[in-house]
Structures are given as structure tokens and as C-alpha cells.
Amino acid sequence: VCCGYKLCHPC
């Protein structure tokens, strides 16, 4: 899952 600014990590 991608969230934040151009960062992909578990939300």
C-alpha cells in the first residue's frame, strides 16, 4: 500500500 509522499509502506 502506498501512502504519504512518494513512499510505499503499510498504512
Swiss-Prot record:
Tissue-level expression: Expressed by the venom duct.
Keyword Secreted: yes
Record PTM 4-hydroxyproline, positions in chain: P10
GO cellular component: extracellular region
Compartment list: Secreted
Keywords for the protein's UniProt record, in alphabetical order: Disulfide bond, Hydroxylation, Neurotoxin, Secreted, Toxin
Function: Chi-conotoxins inhibit the neuronal noradrenaline transporter (NET/SLC6A2).
Name this protein carries in UniProt: Chi-conotoxin CMrVIA
